[in-house]
Amino acid sequence: VAIGETADAVAAGDERCCGYLYHKIFTPVTVDQLVKDGEKFSLLGVEIEAMHLPGHSMGCTAFLFEWTGKKLVISGDVIGTLLVGDFGWDGSIDFDKKIYTESLRRFAKVDSDIMLPGHGMIYFHKPRRRVEQALNAALMQWR
């Protein structure tokens, strides 16, 4: 399951795929299911909403769903949780500060109980505060 920009990157297997950062070849693959921003799909009986949040890379997407009465968000690489003030890595080939900042603004409006990032610690307490911290750090660093 992927948004169009990610599907294009993994189908091409080009420098947008992180294997190149480690001098590895990325074997191209075809995405089974394309989704668009705001689209809902079902996986194992769970309804999941895709939220396209480009900037870190043009295909960054968060996935929102409910599980046992809790609102969860899989944020992937949209936000890092390794360090306070750290808002994620800005070194990808298609990174864009302006677009990323707008995505953080949009993501800061999402209310969830648990955030599962691509890197760092899972947030069990007010994940939106972490997103707001990241947005503030980005705004301060890039003004």
Where are these regions (language model features)?
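Active-site HxH/HxHxD metal-binding segment of metal-dependent hydrolases
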Residues: 1-40
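Short, acidic/turn-prone active-site loops that include or flank metal/cofactor-
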Residues: 5-8, 78-79, 140
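Short, hinge-like loop/turn segments at secondary-structure boundaries
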Residues: 17-22, 93, 133-135
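Metallo-beta-lactamase
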Residues: 30, 40, 47-128, 137-138
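Charged, glycine-enriched surface loops/patches
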Residues: 131-143
